[in-house]
Amino acid sequence: MDTILNERTWKKFLIMDIFLMRNGFYNTKPQESDNGDIPFIGASAVNNGITSWHTLEDIEAAPKAGNADKKVGRNQNINQKIFDGNCICVTNNGSVGYAHYQENRFTCSHDVNPLYANPKMKWRMNKYNALFLCGIIEQERFRWAYGRKWRPSRMKESVISLPVDVTGNPDWEFMENYSKGIMEEEKQRLLQLNI
């Protein structure tokens, strides 16, 4: 599959041209729940960024900062704490530069920036092109560290290289098909192992 990548024409794009970036929510981590169905995405390199699970009620009750009983930190509207799925979450602190595709709604810390498809680029994010983009974004990880955070202002100005079509636009179809091919190869490999 590497040969296929090497045969492509690549072009540099600003992250802010490809994505609409949202800031994560600066909140205290909600009380963890045994029956929670909403993931909390934190500055983690593992488990798709998920550090815990919560109910909507847990998230709604968690204040922006401090202790709710002491009225330190004003609680925010639930709509500011919940993010739509179908996006890529990039860690900007802690395990800096990891990118995780989130298919469903979630909540996250301010150590994470959710990236959504920029409609000006006329593309729709899906699981396959998002997984390709996660790999591309993670190629930038070496530039950042705990002491040099990839905060939103830096992230927006960061450049990534993408395969392009004959018109010089990102080749979304190629990215999607490439990821599907990798997943099919892995599926076949696992089937041969009888796992």
Which sequence ranges carry the predicted segments?
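DNA target-recognition domains and sequence-specific DNA-contacting regions of bacterial/archaeal
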Residues: 17-159
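Non-catalytic DNA-recognition/assembly elements of restriction-modification systems
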Residues: 1-26, 31-49, 166-195
